[in-house]
């Protein structure tokens, strides 16, 4: 599906709009998803770069 309209104002993991987005390599994550992802690995499962 075309998700280009979501832009950088959405978390790429849960796609919700949040005020506290953290930039990952080429996308953004909300703090909630970032904390969940950090519990399983130090690399982002979406872009494979270090969190």
From Swiss-Prot:
<keyword id="KW-0449">Lipoprotein</keyword>
<keyword id="KW-1035">Host cytoplasm</keyword>
<dbReference type="GO" id="GO:0044423">
    <property type="term" value="C:virion component"/>
</dbReference>
<comment type="function">
    <text>Plays a crucial role in virion assembly and budding. Expressed late in the virus life cycle, it acts as an inhibitor of viral transcription and RNA synthesis by interacting with the viral polymerase L. Presumably recruits the NP encapsidated genome to cellular membranes at budding sites via direct interaction with NP. Plays critical roles in the final steps of viral release by interacting with host TSG101, a member of the vacuolar protein-sorting pathway and using other cellular host proteins involved in vesicle formation pathway.</text>
</comment>
<comment type="subunit">
    <text>Interacts with protein NP; this interaction probably directs the encapsidated genome to budding sites. Interacts (via RING-type zinc finger) with polymerase L; this interaction inhibits viral transcription and replication, Z partially blocks the product exit tunnel for the releasing nascent RNA product. Interacts with the glycoprotein complex; this interaction plays a role in virion budding.</text>
</comment>
<keyword id="KW-0863">Zinc-finger</keyword>
<dbReference type="Pfam" id="PF03854">
    <property type="entry name" value="zf-P11"/>
</dbReference>
<dbReference type="GO" id="GO:0003723">
    <property type="term" value="F:RNA binding"/>
</dbReference>
<keyword id="KW-1032">Host cell membrane</keyword>
<keyword id="KW-0479">Metal-binding</keyword>
<keyword id="KW-1043">Host membrane</keyword>
<dbReference type="GO" id="GO:0020002">
    <property type="term" value="C:host cell plasma membrane"/>
</dbReference>
<dbReference type="GO" id="GO:0008270">
    <property type="term" value="F:zinc ion binding"/>
</dbReference>
<keyword id="KW-0472">Membrane</keyword>
<keyword id="KW-0946">Virion</keyword>
<dbReference type="GO" id="GO:0044220">
    <property type="term" value="C:host cell perinuclear region of cytoplasm"/>
</dbReference>
<feature type="zinc finger region" description="RING-type; atypical">
    <location>
        <begin position="11"/>
        <end position="47"/>
    </location>
</feature>
<dbReference type="InterPro" id="IPR038485">
    <property type="entry name" value="Z_RING-type_Znf_sf"/>
</dbReference>
<dbReference type="GO" id="GO:0016020">
    <property type="term" value="C:membrane"/>
</dbReference>
<comment type="similarity">
    <text>Belongs to the arenaviridae Z protein family.</text>
</comment>
<keyword id="KW-0862">Zinc</keyword>
<dbReference type="InterPro" id="IPR003224">
    <property type="entry name" value="Z_RING_Znf"/>
</dbReference>
<protein>
    <recommendedName>
        <fullName>RING finger protein Z</fullName>
    </recommendedName>
</protein>
<keyword id="KW-0945">Host-virus interaction</keyword>
């Amino acid at each position: 599906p075309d998700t280009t309209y979501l832009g950088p104002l959405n978390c790429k993991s849960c796609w919700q709009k949040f005020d506290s987005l953290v930039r990952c390599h080429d996308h953004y994550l909300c703090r909630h998803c970032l904390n969940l992802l950090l519990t399983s690995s130090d690399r982002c499962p979406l872009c494979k770069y270090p969190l």
